[in-house]
Amino acid sequence: MATPEKAAAVAELTDKFRSSNAAVLTEYRGLTVAQLKTLRRSLGENAQYAVVKNTLTKIAANEAGITLDDQLFAGPTAVAFVTGDPVESAKGLRDFAKDNPNLVIKGGVLDGKAMSADEIKKLADLESREVLLSKLAGAFKGKQSQTAQLFQALPSKLVRTVDALRAKQDEQGGAE
């Protein structure tokens, strides 16, 4: 039977899984408290990094409708719950792991879909949402200006063709 404390912890973790855009599971063995504080700061304001109990986390994920591989729960585990841009937090974890090899990214969840550690690293390689949206807007603007130039070119080409035909007819008419 679960104690009230464990039930409350599971309820809190379940709520975090449901309210987060992403959750990244990591192994933190060998990191100091100071390093964990630095990691929390590097994740940004839209992420919470918490050391969790594996069994309670697995139960909470299942209650949130998320199926995670049992291998993700081997060893000491901490979870980064991301409520903002998942790319920003994934970059923070990746960059911190480069400098601190004791941090191991195990895998995670993005919008309810389980992701491997490699997929999390690929997510970190993406540009931020704002940059991608600005590139998309630039592409649309470029296409619109090309389309406008095309529509402007068609009538002017038609006018030049008609003028050339008129000039040719005038030459032929004048030569007769």
Curated annotation (Swiss-Prot):
Coiled coil: none annotated. GO terms for molecular function: large ribosomal subunit rRNA binding; structural constituent of ribosome. It comes from the Bacteria. GO terms for cellular component: cytosolic large ribosomal subunit. Keywords: Ribonucleoprotein, Ribosomal protein, RNA-binding, rRNA-binding. Pfam families: Ribosomal_L10. SUPFAM superfamilies: Ribosomal protein L10-like. InterPro entries: Ribosomal_uL10 (IPR001790), Ribosomal_uL10-like_sf (IPR043141), Ribosomal_uL10_bac (IPR022973), Ribosomal_uL10_bac_type (IPR047865), Ribosomal_uL10_CS_bac (IPR002363). One of its GO terms (biological process) is translation. NCBIfam families: PRK00099.1-1 (NF000955). Belongs to the universal ribosomal protein uL10 family. Part of the ribosomal stalk of the 50S ribosomal subunit. The N-terminus interacts with L11 and the large rRNA to form the base of the stalk. The C-terminus forms an elongated spine to which L12 dimers bind in a sequential fashion forming a multimeric L10(L12)X complex. Forms part of the ribosomal stalk, playing a central role in the interaction of the ribosome with GTP-bound translation factors. This is Large ribosomal subunit protein uL10. It comes from Streptomyces coelicolor (strain ATCC BAA-471 / A3(2) / M145). The lineage of its organism: Bacteria, Bacillati, Actinomycetota, Actinomycetes, Kitasatosporales.
